[in-house]
Each structure stands twice: as structure tokens, then as C-alpha cells.
Amino acid sequence: MDYDVIVIGAGPGGYVAAIRAAQLGKKTAIIDKQWMGGVCLNVGCIPSKSLLKNADVAHTLLKRGKELGFSFDNLNLDFSVAVKRSRQVSNRLVKGIGFLMKKNGIDVHMGVAKLVAKDTVEVTAEDGTMISLQAKDIIVATGASAMVPPVWEVDGEKVLTYLEAITQEKLPESVVIIGSGAIGVEFATVWNSYGVDVTIVEMLPRIVPMEDEEVSAELTKALKKRKIKMLTGHKVEAIETVEDAGVKITISAGDEEKILEAEQALVAIGFRPNSQKTGLEDVGVQIDERGFVSIDEKMATNVPGIWAIGDVTGKLMLAHVGSAMGILAAIGYTARRP
């Protein structure tokens, strides 16, 4: 099947790029192996903000209810309902993406994509069937996945990434969150609001270390007020799951070691690019030492006709940044091609 443009990845970068390409008169296809809307809409920014809204209401009722005029004898906080609501919010928006694809005449192919030539993509569906798509231009928007050191085993029950944490309906009694970026701090806030004993472990000297120091200072005050424990300047040496119990986490600071015990551990130390097994290197696309796709200011890779946007490039890993990059990529190849 021949197209003007093929977009690999249907997250906020990919689907926006596909829409813009179609609006510019290009015959467009989009491929995703799992979800329309990508991580953001399905298991990332959207459901997490839904949970944060529930958490904000729960925290307000518990801590300031009487002050604000709410009286109750038996307040019941059902976290499973909060999670179900977050799934409903997510699913509604994902359906909206499907509508936008149809409205703009974009062909959707669900399956695993692999570049087999600089103008050809093979798509393998879940049932094993394979199709071959060709295009003048290909936009790579494959995103990123949770980074987990090989020695840490994520079992989805005691040791989690955001992927398992965002959908679990049962609250742990206690949790150690490894990493204090946006994901770690968001889950700390949500779980703490529902009464979970939360400890954040951060290797660097302050929480949200990629933000300005003023942001870290204010957020530290806010989390301390909520009685969320923070251990900065501590490195996680080992995570051990305990049979019929939870986890033991060995942390160190200088020459001192100590063990934290909790029902669960959440690994939130960053992301790795989804660039492996994509065929990018096979067709000559330059990948840096960390696995990110190298691009110029127009989102072009070193291979003419192949573009890359969003998290897989290692730029600012934010949904709206990916969307803006998608529009730039569309403008770039449209200006170059008749």
C-alpha cells in the first residue's frame, strides 16, 4: 500500500503529525502496536490528572472538611472508583482520537512496525498477519518506556512502574517511590491523599531535580506538610521481594546503608527510547549512545525522508512538545515535497 506519509506511533506527537499531514493534502497512514493516543492518553498524563483530581478532593475533605462546612460521620474513600473514573476519562479521549483519524481520512494500522527500507514499513498485527506499506516520508514517533535497571525485577505486584501503578485499584498500605520526577511526585500525592504511607527516595540532592531549585524548595515544603517522607541524596542498591510480605529496599548515602520496608515499590527513575527493533539503524538512521534518534531543527534524521519527533528523540519529554514537533515535521516535508 502506498502513502505520502506514514507515522509510526499514535501518541500526542504521532497523531498530531498525521492530522497535520492529512490537512496538508497528503495521503496518510498511522501505525501503533497498542493504543491510539499513546502513553499520555492511556496510562500517563490524562489518567494521572484524573487521579490527582480525586486525590485533591479526598485531601480537602479529610483535612479541611469541617472548616469548609462539610459534616460527615463515616467518610468512605473508595480508591477503586477513582481508578475506574480515570479509565473512563481516558477511554473517552481515546475514542476521540479514533474519530479524528476517520474525520481526516487517515488510515489506521494496529501492529508492530519495522522499517525494512527507507521508504518501506512492515506492520505485524497481533494475529501474526503482515502487511507492507510504502511512503515518500516516514515520521517516527515511537515514544519511550519506563527505565528499569536489569537487576531490578518488575513483577507488577510488589515492584511496579507507572504502567502497573496507574491501573491498580487496591491501595498499598505503604510504598517506596524510587525517583522524584513528575511521575514519582504525582503518585506520592495521589497515594498519600488516600492514607498510604509514602517514602520518596531520590539519588540527587533535591526532589524534582530537573526543575528550578525554587520549584524543588516549594514542593518539598508542600510534601513535608502532607507528611510524605523524602530521602534525597540516597542511592538504591537493591530491591528484594519478600515472600508473603512486601519489599525490602537497600539504600545508601555515602558509607551508610539502611533498609526500607514497604508493601510496594514504584520505580520512576526515567525513560528509555523505543528505538530498538524498529529497523531504524538497519536503514542508516543515526542513534546516539543512549538510544535516542538524532534530528535537526526541522525534525529530520540523517536519512532523507525519515523524520523523528517526541520522546524517542530525547528532547523535552512532554506531550505538547511532541505535538509541536509533529507539526514542524509536517511543515518540513511539505515544504520540501511537491
Task: Give each language-model segment a name.
Residues 12-17, 39, 159, 184-187, ...:
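Short glycine/serine/threonine-rich phosphate/pyrophosphate-binding segments
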Residues 6-8, 113, 133-143, 178, ...:
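Short hydrophobic core segments
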Residues 3-30, 184-193:
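N-terminal Rossmann-like FAD-binding beta1-loop-alpha1 element of flavoenzymes
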Residues 16, 20-21, 40, 138, ...:
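Hydrophobic/aromatic ligand-binding patch that stacks against planar heteroaromatic rings
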Residues 177, 182-203:
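Rossmann-like dinucleotide/phosphate-binding beta-alpha-beta segment
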Residues 9-14, 143, 179-184, 270, ...:
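Conserved phosphate-binding and hydrolysis motifs of nucleotide-dependent enzymes
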Residues 2-3, 19-26, 31-171, 199, ...:
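Glycine-rich flavin
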Residues 155-171, 259-337:
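FAD-site-proximal beta/loop scaffold in flavoenzymes
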